[in-house]
Amino acid sequence: MRGKFITFEGIDGAGKSTHIGAVAARLRERKDIPAVVTTREPGGTPLGEDLRQILLHRKMHLETEALLMFAARREHIAEVIEPALARGDWVISDRFTDATFAYQGGGRGLATSRLETLETWVQDGLQPDLTLLFDVPLETASERLAGAREPDKFEAESRAFFERTRAEYLRRAAQAPERFRVIDATQSIEAIRVELEKIISTL
């Protein structure tokens, strides 16, 4: 039986990464799941991690940025995601294609049609079974990021950029309610954990 593919999404500072390990641990307790693979985008492969460093720290044309995102994604799908799903393993990814539509599309203003063309080519129909969107007001996200490590290129973007990015995430969630679950990430860590367990138990 083919495995399940779960993605975690949200703007920087939403707190999604805090919960990935806990969800993976809970799923690993289940006897019906051979293994759980946790990964991230951009990244997930040696080439993908190299591209991640370029994407997070180098200035480039917005179309170049999108192309590199999808190049890293193609390698990720071919080398990690598809083989794991074919084995029956479950895959949890910290970001996937929705992030590209939100950041490069919503945030940067790249035409959705161009991103959709790349998505069709690179993914060949692959979509997550479940996308958990961690949503927070920009003020909350900014407070969480303040005083953290040196911000990368995206974390240092303007408030307007993140307003557009968040709006695009929510728009996509509204368009695909069967796949998305929007999490109020202003809740306590414990409240979010309980909510996530309820959602995961339905898979």
Swiss-Prot record:
Domain of life the protein comes from: Bacteria
Keyword Ubl conjugation: no
One record GO biological process: dTTP biosynthetic process
Catalyzed chemical reaction(s): dTMP + ATP = dTDP + ADP
GO cellular component: cytosol
Enzyme Commission (EC) number: 2.7.4.9
SUPFAM superfamilies to which the protein is assigned, alphabetical: P-loop containing nucleoside triphosphate hydrolases (SSF52540)
Keywords: ATP-binding, Kinase, Nucleotide biosynthesis, Nucleotide-binding, Transferase
Cysteine pairs bridged by disulfides in the record: none
Residues that, per the record, bind ATP: 10-17
Pfam annotation, one family: Thymidylate_kin
GO molecular function terms listed in the Swiss-Prot or TrEMBL record: ATP binding; dTMP kinase activity
Keyword Kinase: yes
NCBIfam families per record: DTMP_kinase
Family: Belongs to the thymidylate kinase family.
Summary of the function given for this chain in its UniProt record: Phosphorylation of dTMP to form dTDP in both de novo and salvage pathways of dTTP synthesis.
Name of the protein in question: Thymidylate kinase
Species classification: Bacteria, Pseudomonadati, Pseudomonadota, Betaproteobacteria, Burkholderiales
